């Protein structure tokens, strides 16, 4: 019982220094040379009495040492902080962890009379003691006696080597070597080597090697090797290797290799390899390899390989390979390969391969291959192949292949092939092939093939083939083939073939074949064949064959055959056959056969046979037979037979038979038959039919039909029909119909219809219809319709429709529609529509629509729409739309839309939209949109959008968006967005976004974003984002983000983020983040983070973080963190942390942390921590901590800690701690501790401790402690202690040089009788 002593608790640094710089011993007396008995922490030693009170003065560092010391009660002074006392001297009894220190105080407090009151003062405190019963263990002392001391009884054949504060428990034939403060428990035939503060528990036949602060638990026949602070738990036959701070849990016969900070959990027979910070969980018979920060979870028999930051979850017998940042979830027997940032989810037996950033979800036994950024969802037994950015969704047994940006959705057992940007939706057992930008929707069992930009919709068992830009809609069992720009709609089991620009609508069981620009509408089970530009409408069970430009309308069960430009209208059950340009109208159950250019009109149950160019009009139950060019008009119940060119006019129930060229005039119920060239005259209500060259004159309300070259004159309310080359004259409210080459003159409110080459002149409010090559002249508010090559002239408010090659001239408020190759001229506010190759000229406020190759010129506020290859010229405020290859020129505030290869020129405030390969030129504040390969030039404040390969030049405040391979040039304040391979040049304060391989150049305060392989150049204060392989150059205060392999150069205070293999160069105060293999060079005050294999060079006060194999070079006061195999070089006062195999060089006062196999070189007063197999070189007063197989070199007052097979070299007053098979060398006044089979050499006044079979050599006044088989050599006045095992316990044999025949500098050993003898010379 000690009545005058108390126990205190305090903390010291890892090197046992307190806050005042006093070095506390590991055991024994410590005294303050500057003691002053006054309150305060200065000038004395301090501690917590009995460990109770405020913990604020205690150190919270992870490597802080807890010290328990004995203090005289009469020397203690209470200070202000609760529980803390001050004293001049103390005796250290215990050094360890927080738990071990508190346990020591708890177990030994009963040996002391507690001090309950303390009074401060120079005379010492007044102590009132309270006695407590108990036994006391002797404290560890530093006393040295030349006597034999007995140890505690040990189990048979157990070897324990422990430093201060450690606890060892071993069974039969176990070997335990522990650093200070460690706790080890081992079964039979086990070997444990632990650093300070570690805890090891092992079953029989196990091997454990642990760094400081680690915790190890192992079953039988296990092998564990752990870095500092790690936790390992393994069952029988496991092999665990862990980096510092890692956690490993393994079942029987498993193998785990973990990086620092990683977590591993494995069942039986597993193999796990984890990077630092990763998490692995595996069932039995699995193999997992993980990058740093990744998470892996696998069931039985799985094989997972993951990049850093990835997440992998797998069922039994699966194989997963994941890029960094990817997420994988797989059922049993699945195979997944994922790019970085991708997400994969698969059920049993699936095979997934995904690019970076893609998402894959698959059912059982599916195969998915995805480009980067794509999304795939598949049912079982499916096969999906996707381009980048595409989306695929498939049910069971489907096969999908998609281009980039496409969307595919399919039912079970479907096959889809999609171009880029296309959308596909298919039911089960469907086949789809889509061009880029197309949309396909199909039900079960359909087959769709679509060109780019087309739309396909199909029911069950349908087949669709679509050209680009076409739209197809089909029900079950349909077959559709469409040209570009066409629209097809079909019922089930229909067959449609469409030319470009055609429109088809069909009921079930129909067959439609359409030329380009044609329109077909059919009910169920119809058969339609149409030429280009034709229009067909058919009821059920009808058959229609139409030439180009023809119009067909038929009810059910009808048969229509039409030549080009003909018009056919039939009721149910009719049979019509028409030549080109003919017109056929039939009632139900009628039969019409018409020659080209003929017009046939029949009531129900009629039969009409017409020659070419003939005109037939019949009531119901009539029979008409006409030669070519003849005109027949009959009311109901009439029977007319006419020769070619004849004209027949008959009243109701009349019968007319005319020879060719004859003229017929008949009243009501008349029958007229005319030969060729005849003249017919009839009063009111009469019906006349005339032959060739005939002349017809009729009263009011008459109806005249004339043959070729005939002349007709009719009064009020007359109806005239003339053959080819005929001349017609009619007063007000007349209706005129003329044949080829005819001349028609009509008064106000007249209606004229003219044949080919006819000439028509009409008064006010006239309606004119002319055949091919006709000439029409009309006053105000006339309506003109002309055939091919016709010429039309109309007054104000006229409406003109012209055939192919026609010429039209119209006054104010006119509406003109022209056929192919026509020429149109209109005054203000006219509306013009032209066919192919037409020329249109219109005044202000006109609207023009032109066919292919047309030329349009319009005045103020005009709207122009032109076909392919057209040329458009418009004044201010015009709206122009042009077809392929067109040229557009517009004035102020114009809007232009151009087709492929068009050229556009627009004035101020214009909006231009151009097709492929177009050229656009616009003034200020214009809006331009261009197709592929187009060239755009715009003034300031313009907005440009360009297609592939386009070139854009814009003025001030412009916005440019360009397609692939485009070139963009913009002035200040421009916003540029470019496609692949584009080149962008922008003025001041511009924003640029560029596609793949683009080149960007921007002025001050620009924002640049570039795709793959792009090159970026920007002035000060720019923000650059670049894709793969890009090169970025930026001015002052720039922010750069670059993709893979990019090169970045930035001005002052820049922020750079680069992808894999990039090169970065930045000035002062920059922040750099680089991907794998990158090279970063930054100015002072920079922050650099680099990926694997990178090389970093930075100025003063920089912060560098690098991936595996990187090289870091930095200025003073830098903080460097590097991955595996990296090389670090830094200035003074730097902190370096490196991964495995790294090489570190640092200046004075640096702190270095490295993984195994690293090399460290530092200045004075540095702290180095290295992993297994490391090489460490440090300056004066350094602290070195390393794993096994390390080489450590330090200056004076250094502290070295290493595992087995290490080499340690240090200066004077150093402390060295190493495992088995190590080589330790130190200067004077050093302390060396090592395991078995070691070599220890030190200078004068040193202390050496080693295990069995070691060699210890020291200078004068040293203390040497060795176990069995060791050799001790010391200088003068030294102590030699041999620890001997006699089969029951350890005994210490102590000797001093210079006494008892022990000479200095001579090697000594113990013989079999525990006698100290000279080592024989070898």
UniProtKB/Swiss-Prot annotation:
The keyword Transmembrane helix does not apply. It is found in: Cell outer membrane. Keywords: Cell outer membrane, Ice nucleation, Membrane, Repeat. The keyword Repeat applies. One of its GO terms (cellular component) is cell outer membrane. Residues 271-302, 327-350, 373-398, 423-446 have a biased composition (Polar residues). One of its GO terms (molecular function) is ice binding. SUPFAM superfamilies: Phage fibre proteins. Pfam families: Ice_nucleation. It is a peripheral membrane protein. Residues 271-303, 327-358, 372-399, 423-448 are annotated as: Disordered. Belongs to the bacterial ice nucleation protein family. Contains many imperfect repeats of a consensus octapeptide A-G-Y-G-S-T-X-T; further on a 16-residue and a regional 48-residue periodicity is superimposed. Ice nucleation proteins enable bacteria to nucleate crystallization in supercooled water. This is Ice nucleation protein InaA. It comes from Pantoea ananas (Erwinia uredovora).
């Amino acid at each position: 019982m000690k009545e005058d002593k108390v126990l205190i608790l305090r903390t010291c640094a890892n090197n046992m220094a307190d806050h005042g710089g006093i070095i506390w011993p590991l055991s024994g007396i410590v005294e303050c040379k500057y003691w002053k008995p006054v309150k305060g922490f200065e000038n004395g030693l301090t501690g917590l009495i009995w460990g109770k009170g405020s913990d604020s003065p205690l150190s919270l560092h992870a490597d802080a040492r807890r010290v328990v010391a004995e203090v005289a009660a009469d020397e203690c002074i209470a200070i202000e902080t609760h529980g803390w006392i001050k004293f001049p001297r103390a005796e250290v009894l215990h050094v360890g962890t927080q738990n071990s220190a508190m346990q020591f105080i708890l177990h030994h407090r009963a040996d002391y009379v507690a001090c309950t009151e303390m009074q401060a003062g120079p005379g010492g405190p007044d102590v009132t003691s309270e006695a407590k019963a108990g036994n006391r263990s002797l404290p560890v002392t530093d006393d040295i006696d030349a006597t034999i001391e007995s140890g505690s009884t040990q189990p048979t054949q157990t070897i324990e080597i422990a430093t201060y504060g450690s606890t060892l428990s071993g069974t039969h034939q176990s070997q335990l070597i522990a650093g200070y403060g460690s706790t080890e428990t081992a079964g039979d035939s086990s070997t444990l080597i632990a650093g300070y503060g570690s805890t090891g528990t092992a079953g029989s036949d196990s091997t454990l090697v642990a760094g400081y602060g680690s915790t190890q638990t192992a079953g039988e026949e296990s092998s564990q090797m752990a870095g500092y602070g790690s936790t390992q738990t393994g069952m029988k036959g496991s092999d665990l290797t862990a980096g510092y701070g890692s956690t490993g849990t393994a079942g029987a016969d498993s193998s785990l290799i973990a990086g620092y900070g990683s977590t591993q959990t494995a069942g039986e027979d597993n193999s796990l390899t984890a990077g630092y910070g990763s998490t692995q969980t595996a069932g039995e018979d699995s193999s997992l390899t993980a990058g740093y920060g990744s998470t892996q979870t696998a069931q039985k028999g799985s094989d997972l390989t993951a990049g850093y930051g990835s997440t992998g979850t797998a069922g039994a017998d699966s194989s997963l390979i994941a890029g960094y940042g990817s997420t994988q979830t797989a059922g049993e027997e699945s195979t997944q390969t994922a790019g970085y940032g991708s997400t994969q989810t698969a059920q049993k037996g699936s095979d997934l391969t995904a690019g970076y950033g893609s998402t894959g979800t698959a059912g059982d036994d599916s195969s998915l291959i995805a480009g980067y950024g794509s999304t795939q969802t598949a049912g079982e037994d499916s096969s999906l192949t996707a381009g980048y950015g595409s989306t695929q969704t498939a049910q069971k047994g489907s096969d999908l292949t998609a281009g980039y940006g496409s969307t595919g959705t399919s039912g079970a057992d479907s096959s889809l092939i999609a171009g880029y940007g296309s959308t596909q939706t298919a039911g089960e057992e469907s086949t789809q092939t889509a061009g880029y930008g197309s949309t396909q929707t199909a039900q079960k069992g359909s087959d769709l093939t679509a060109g780019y930009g087309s739309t396909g919709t199909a029911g069950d068992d349908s087949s669709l083939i679509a050209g680009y830009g076409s739209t197809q809609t089909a029900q079950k069992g349909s077959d559709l083939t469409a040209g570009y720009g066409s629209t097809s709609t079909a019922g089930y089991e229909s067959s449609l073939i469409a030319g470009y620009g055609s429109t088809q609508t069909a009921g079930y069981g129909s067959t439609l074949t359409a030329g380009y620009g044609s329109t077909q509408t059919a009910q169920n089970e119809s058969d339609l064949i149409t030429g280009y530009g034709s229009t067909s409408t058919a009821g059920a069970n009808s058959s229609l064959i139409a030439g180009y430009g023809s119009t067909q309308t038929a009810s059910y069960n009808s048969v229509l055959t039409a030549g080009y430009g003909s018009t056919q209208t039939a009721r149910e059950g009719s049979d019509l056959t028409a030549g080109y340009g003919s017109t056929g109208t039939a009632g139900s159950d009628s039969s019409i056969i018409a020659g080209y250019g003929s017009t046939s009109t029949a009531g129900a149950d009629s039969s009409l046979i017409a020659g070419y160019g003939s005109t037939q009009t019949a009531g119901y139950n009539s029979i008409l037979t006409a030669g070519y060019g003849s005109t027949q008009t009959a009311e109901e119940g009439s029977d007319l037979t006419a020769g070619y060119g004849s004209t027949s006019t008959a009243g109701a129930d009349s019968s007319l038979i005319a020879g060719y060229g004859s003229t017929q005039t008949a009243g009501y119920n008349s029958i007229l038959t005319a030969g060729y060239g005849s003249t017919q005259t009839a009063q009111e209500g009469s019906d006349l039919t005339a032959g060739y060259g005939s002349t017809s004159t009729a009263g009011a309300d008459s109806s005249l039909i004339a043959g070729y070259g005939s002349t007709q004159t009719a009064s009020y309310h007359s109806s005239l029909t003339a053959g080819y080359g005929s001349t017609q004259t009619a007063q007000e409210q007349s209706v005129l119909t003329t044949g080829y080459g005819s001349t028609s003159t009509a008064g106000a409110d007249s209606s004229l219809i003219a044949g080919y080459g006819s000439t028509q002149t009409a008064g006010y409010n006239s309606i004119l219809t002319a055949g091919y090559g006709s000439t029409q002249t009309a006053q105000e508010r006339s309506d003109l319709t002309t055939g091919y090559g016709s010429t039309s002239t109309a007054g104000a408010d006229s409406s003109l429709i012209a055939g192919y090659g026609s010429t039209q001239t119209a006054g104010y408020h006119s509406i003109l529609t022209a056929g192919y190759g026509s020429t149109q001229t209109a005054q203000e506010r006219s509306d013009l529509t032209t066919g192919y190759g037409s020329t249109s000229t219109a005044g202000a406020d006109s609207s023009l629509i032109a066919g292919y190759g047309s030329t349009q010129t319009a005045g103020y506020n005009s709207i122009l729409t032109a076909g392919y290859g057209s040329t458009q010229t418009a004044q201010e405020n015009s709206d122009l739309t042009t077809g392929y290859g067109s040229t557009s020129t517009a004035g102020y505030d114009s809007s232009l839309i151009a087709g492929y290869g068009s050229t556009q020129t627009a004035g101020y405030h214009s909006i231009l939209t151009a097709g492929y390969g177009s050229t656009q030129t616009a003034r200020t504040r214009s809006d331009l949109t261009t197709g592929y390969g187009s060239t755009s030039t715009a003034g300031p404040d313009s907005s440009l959008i360009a297609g592939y390969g386009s070139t854009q030049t814009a003025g001030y405040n412009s916005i440019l968006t360009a397609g692939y391979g485009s070139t963009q040039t913009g002035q200040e304040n421009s916003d540029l967005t470019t496609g692949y391979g584009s080149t962008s040049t922008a003025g001041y304060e511009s924003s640029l976004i560029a596609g793949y391989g683009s080149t960007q150049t921007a002025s001050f305060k620009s924002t640049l974003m570039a795709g793959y392989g792009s090159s970026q150049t920007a002035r000060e204060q720019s923000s650059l984002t670049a894709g793969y392989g890009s090169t970025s150059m930026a001015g002052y205060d720039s922010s750069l983000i670059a993709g893979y392999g990019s090169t970045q150069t930035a001005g002052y205070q820049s922020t750079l983020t680069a992808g894999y293999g990039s090169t970065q160069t930045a000035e002062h105060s920059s922040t750099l983040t680089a991907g794998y293999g990158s090279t970063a060079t930054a100015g002072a005050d920079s922050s650099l983070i680099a990926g694997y294999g990178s090389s970093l060079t930075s100025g003063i006060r920089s912060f560098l973080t690098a991936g595996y194999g990187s090289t870091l070079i930095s200025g003073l006061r830098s903080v460097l963190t590097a991955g595996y195999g990296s090389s670090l070089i830094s200035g003074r006062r730097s902190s370096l942390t490196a991964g495995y195999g790294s090489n570190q060089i640092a200046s004075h006062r640096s702190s270095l942390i490295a993984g195994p196999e690293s090399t460290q070189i530092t200045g004075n007063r540095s702290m180095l921590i290295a992993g297994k197999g490391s090489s460490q070189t440090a300056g004066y007063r350094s602290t070195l901590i390393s794993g096994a197989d390390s080489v450590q070199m330090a200056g004076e007052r250094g502290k070295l800690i290493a595992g087995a097979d290490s080499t340690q070299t240090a200066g004077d007053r150093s402390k060295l701690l190493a495992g088995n098979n190590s080589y330790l060398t130190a200067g004077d006044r050093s302390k060396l501790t090592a395991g078995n089979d070691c070599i220890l050499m030190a200078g004068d006044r040193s202390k050496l401790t080693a295990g069995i079979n070691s060699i210890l050599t020291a200078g004068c006044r040293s203390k040497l402690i060795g176990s069995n088989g060791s050799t001790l050599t010391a200088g003068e006045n030294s102590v030699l202690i041999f620890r001997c095992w006699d089969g029951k316990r350890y005994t210490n044999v102590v000797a001093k040089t210079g006494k008892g025949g022990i000479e200095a500098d001579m090697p000594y050993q113990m013989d079999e009788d525990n006698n100290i003898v000279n080592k024989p010379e070898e």
